[in-house]
Curated annotation (Swiss-Prot):
Domain C2 residues, every copy: 240-358, 404-521, 555-676
Full protein name: Multiple C2 and transmembrane domain-containing protein 1
Sequence positions that bind Ca(2+) 4: 438, 491, 493, 499
Keywords assigned by UniProt, alphabetized: Calcium, Cytoplasmic vesicle, Endoplasmic reticulum, Endosome, Membrane, Metal-binding, Repeat, Synapse, Transmembrane, Transmembrane helix
Biased composition annotated in UniProt, kind: Gly residues: 31-43
Subcellular locations according to the entry: Cytoplasmic vesicle, Secretory vesicle, Synaptic vesicle membrane; Recycling endosome; Endoplasmic reticulum membrane
Biased composition (Low complexity): 147-168, 219-228
Length: 951
């Protein structure tokens, strides 16, 4: 026993082997005894596979001899067994976080340098790597085999470690790929890595971490030092877990960070009938986790629907299956459930299209035959892309708080993303010989357009089978090929579900670009035709970039932008009016929307129908985004809307605040703090957002675009009946009418000689005007009124007063909206009286239009928007000169010829009134209040701090 004791003493004083290396050895010794009692070295070679090379026997007097002596001592073996369990627990809890702590896979050559500051990894390199490298050098062929490389019979002894190390940021290795790699590689060191990657996926990251470190010499340790080292490792692992987050030890998948799942919803077969007529109106929902990621269109009266719709979903991991649910659409009632199915994403082969047939089941009635759904799916790993540069673009559906999400990632090289590849301009001309859906032999038709997530709904043409819409709108093209545009025609029915007239499709990939195509489309599943004009044009200047990539700060790019919108290039693309750059820098003091007292804010920037988003800053009330958005300006009178929401993964996003900024009120290059307002833009809410905005535009193009119809928003809130809104519009209309009534009273008082001096002056003025009146004096009088008000304003005698009456009405309306939101949850949709509501809404809207028209005329002369007032002065000067030099009969003759020949010259021209189009750009009193900037008040909090849902 003396030589054996001496060997053991040498082991304790050795410099190269570490304490954990001896634990690995004793694990092998224990397994060998448990299986056959032949010892660790004796039993090991008998169970090795053919692909596993046998290590050379160690020279005498080495570490293995010493460990054999230690293993023969029973008292010491019990201590080693305890330490073995502790070591299993340490690696079970720490290994997944070691791998997941880096956003990218660690390169073997740079892993040690990248994580030099990590306490846990430094300790593991110091205490694990020297033994592996030292023993490999000493033996020349293999050295010590860790548990990953033991025999198959010994695998159950470390099942806890194997299961706990299953979470990794790398893609899960497939069996055929692993076998091919094992045949190509050679050497025991490679075999060690192969065994770990197949049975213990999480250890591959550990090997990459440990490999590049040089084997430093270890100082001599005392007998108590291994226990201290063991406690240090446990403490470091627990700290690492608390920093990164708890790992799920039961998850068997490894993720690269992001996957793209491309789904093509083909068709359904033999679906269940849910309507009384023996048919259904099916549509499909896709969910991952508890979040809806896609909803298909509705196929009416069909049990074998054909959708052929595509969806692209970005997912963080493959743990959650794809949940497919089919419903029958019921207007005004709860949709009927038609079955569901799950698709296990872990069974899909990467980068390969897979046709999937799913059998629909009802959990409550598992024996019922509910039909099948056919899909095509492609799963693609997205490696090397960082989440912190992910830009989300959500298109909210009308009256929906859910988001249809597209991920738009910034380029790693330029960190700049152009969002769409082109624009398709659509003009809906007319319908011909449509199907009669009403009892009177007519219809009230309207048309719905859908291109991907974009939707547009035309106006309703009452009581006609040959409607004339003459509407123009634009869609964005996100695919190089163009995609399929779905078109459906409907008949509007008050109080019940609208009737389906027919459908058709347009394959945009078959149309040539930069050319207008006239299409006469036959309506399938119905009667009649639709006439369209479709034009595909190049991409507009719309992109997202980091703050470091700034077009306006690059002198060369700035000169190109200024050149493009110079006054000399007036007739080059009249729709391209200007360039807008918005820097979303940060926000401060936002409202806390979560129960933790924090929020997950992201910012939405909207200009007409262009809608872009920043990334989400989690758990922060003072987020910094530092993003730059660029837009193409089509109308200089547009309003930039910036809205802050709180992201909520389980339900709709929460509203935090909003600002509305007219483009003509922007001061270029100035960083300003905008106080966030409530949803109706009538009062302040908590928080301030810092923006820096630059606008460059061509004034001549902007003036010409003022005289054509405004661009309609695709997604607008449905009008609902509101007592306060109805009263507000009535009061606004009454105020405009009262002005005319007071003017009539004033004239009548002159006729009645209530004030003789005033009546005498009015009589003399009347005689002079009538005797010398010429037609050109009408615009001249308006011109004098504008000029008079202008000099009053610049002289400091501003007669414009803040409309406190409108502000008070808006505050009352906001309180009623809050009550309606609460009451609406209690009332059922079926209890509403549709016909009465539509009549009241129509009256409400007419009052709003009349009141807005009067207020816009007043605000034009009050110089509320100086650009428009100057434009009115120029137009009135031109009209005055025309009326002065040209006889009235010639003017009327030219006007009549133009009206009679307009349809002959341009048969598909959209009817418009230039004067009304001009007035539509002037804000009403309500809009003036909404666009007012609020001064930040740092000393007092806003009066109302409440959490509003996205409406």
């Amino acid at each position: 026993m003396e030589p054996r004791a001496a060997t053991t003493g040498e082991l304790v004083r050795a410099a190269s082997p570490s304490f954990q290396a001896r634990l690995w050895k004793n694990l092998q010794l224990g397994v060998g005894k448990g299986k056959g009692g032949g010892g660790g070295r004796a039993g090991g070679p008998e169970h090795r596979t053919a692909a596993t090379p046998t290590p050379s026997p160690p020279p005498p007097g080495t570490t293995q001899d010493a460990l054999a002596g230690v293993g023969s001592t029973g008292s010491r073996w019990s201590g080693f067994k305890k330490r073995k369990q502790v070591l299993d627990r340490v690696f079970s809890s720490s290994q997944p976080n070691l791998c997941c702590s880096s956003p990218e896979p660690l390169e073997p050559g740079g892993a040690g340098r990248a994580e030099q500051g990590s306490t846990l990894r430094r300790r593991l390199r110091e205490h694990l790597l020297p033994v592996a490298k030292g023993s490999s050098t000493a033996t020349g062929t293999g050295g010590v085999t860790p548990p990953g490389g033991r025999s198959p019979d010994s695998a159950p002894s470390s099942s806890s470690a194997s299961s706990s190390l299953s979470s990794s940021p790398q893609p899960p290795p497939r069996g055929d790929r692993v076998r091919d790699e094992s045949t190509r590689r050679g050497g025991p060191g490679v075999h060690l890595c192969h065994q770990k990657s197949s049975s213990l996926p999480g250890t591959a990251c550990l090997e990459q971490l440990l490999e590049p470190a040089p084997p430093p010499a270890e100082p001599a340790r005392g007998p108590a030092e291994p226990q201290a080292l063991q406690k240090d490792i446990e403490r470091d692992c627990s700290q690492k877990i608390s920093t990164v987050g708890n790992s799920n030890a039961d998850v068997p998948l490894a993720d690269p960070g992001m996957y793209q799942l491309d789904i093509t919803l083909r068709r359904g077969q033999s679906l269940a009938a849910r309507d009384r007529g023996g048919t259904s109106d099916p549509y499909v929902k896709f969910k991952i986790g508890r979040k809806e990621v896609f909803r298909s269109k509705i196929i009416h009266k069909n049990l074998n629907p054909v959708w052929e719709e595509k969806a692209c979903v970005l997912i963080d991991h493959l743990r959650e299956p794809l949940y497919i649910k089919v419903f029958d659409y019921d207007f005004g009632l709860q949709d009927d459930f038609m079955g569901s199915a799950f698709l296990d994403l872990t069974q899909l082969e990467l980068n390969r299209s897979t046709d999937v047939t799913l059998t629909l089941k009802d959990p409550h009635y598992p024996d019922h035959d509910l039909g099948i759904i056919l899909l095509s799916v492609i799963l693609t790993p997205k490696e090397g892309e960082h989440r912190d540069v992910t830009m989300l673009m959500r298109k909210s559906w009308k009256r929906s708080s859910k988001f249809q999400t597209q991920s738009l990632r910034l380029s790693d090289q330029h960190r700049k993303s152009h969002l769409w590849r082109g624009i398709v301009s659509i003009t809906l001309i007319e319908g011909r010989d449509l199907k009669a859906m009403d009892s009177n032999g007519l219809s009230d038709p309207y048309v719905k357009f859908r291109l991907g997530h974009q939707k547009y709904k035309s106006k309703i043409m009452p009581k006609t089978l040959n409607p004339q819409w003459r509407e123009q709108f634009d869609f964005h093209l996100y695919e190089e090929r163009g995609g399929i545009m779905d078109i459906t025609a409907w008949d509007k029915d008050a109080g019940k579900r609208d009737d389906f007239i027919g459908r058709c499709q347009v394959d945009l990939s078959s149309l040539s670009r930069e050319q207008t195509h006239k299409l006469e489309l036959h309506l399938e599943e119905g009667e009649g035709h639709l006439v369209l004009l479709v034009t595909l044009t190049a991409s507009a200047t719309v992109c997202i970039s980091d703050l470091s990539v700034n077009s306006m700060e690059d002198q060369k790019e700035r000169e190109e932008i200024l050149k493009r919108y110079s006054p000399l290039r007036i007739f080059n693309n009249l729709k391209d009016v200007g360039f807008l750059q918005v820097k979303v820098i940060r926000a401060e003091g936002l409202m806390a929307a979560d129960v933790t007292g924090k929020s997950d804010p992201f910012c939405v920037v909207e200009l007409n129908n262009d809608r872009l988003l920043t990334h989400t800053v989690y758990k922060n009330l003072n987020p910094e985004w530092n993003k730059v958005f660029t837009f193409n300006i089509k109308d200089i009178h547009s309003v930039l809307e910036v809205t802050v929401y709180d992201e909520d993964r389980d339900r709709s996003a929460d509203f935090l605040g909003r600002v509305a900024i007219p483009l003509l009120s922007i001061q270029n290059g100035e960083q300003k703090a905008y106080v966030l307002k409530n949803k109706q833009l009538t009062g302040p809410t908590k928080g301030v957002i810092y923006l820096e905005i630059d606008v460059i535009f061509n004034a001549v193009k902007a003036s010409l675009r003022t005289l054509i119809p405004k661009e309609r928003k695709y997604i607008e809130e449905e009008n609902r009946l509101s007592k306060q809104l109805l009263l507000r519009n009535f009061i606004r209309t009454k105020r405009c009418v009262i002005v005319l009534v007071n003017a009539a009273y004033y004239v009548n008082s002159c006729f009645d000689w209530d004030s003789p001096p005033r009546s005498l002056a009015a009589f003399v003025l009347f005689l002079l005007i009538v005797w010398n009146f010429e037609l050109y004096m009408i615009p001249l009088l308006l011109l004098l009124l504008l000029t008079w008000n202008y000099f009053l304003i610049i002289s400091g005698k501003d007669n414009r007063q803040r409309d406190t009456v409108v502000e008070d009405m808006l505050e009352d309306e906001e309180e009623e909206d809050d009550r309606d939101d609460k009451d609406g949850e209690k009332k059922g949709f079926i209890n509403k009286i549709y016909a009465i509501q539509e009549v009241c809404v129509s009256v409400q809207n007419i009052l709003d239009e009349v009141a807005s028209l009067g207020e816009r005329i007043k605000n034009t002369f009050n110089w509320t928007v100086p650009f428009l007032s100057w434009l009115a002065i120029v137009a009135l000067c031109v009209f005055t000169a025309i009326l002065y030099f040209i006889p009235l009969r010639y003017i009327v003759l030219v006007w009549g010829i133009n009206k009679f020949t307009k349809k002959l010259r341009s048969p598909y021209a959209i009817d418009n009134n230039e004067l009304l189009d001009f007035l539509s750009r002037v804000p009403s009193d309500v809009q003036v209040v909404q666009y007012q900037e609020l001064k930040p008040d740092h000393s007092h909090s806003p009066y109302k701090r409440k959490k509003n849902n996205l409406g």
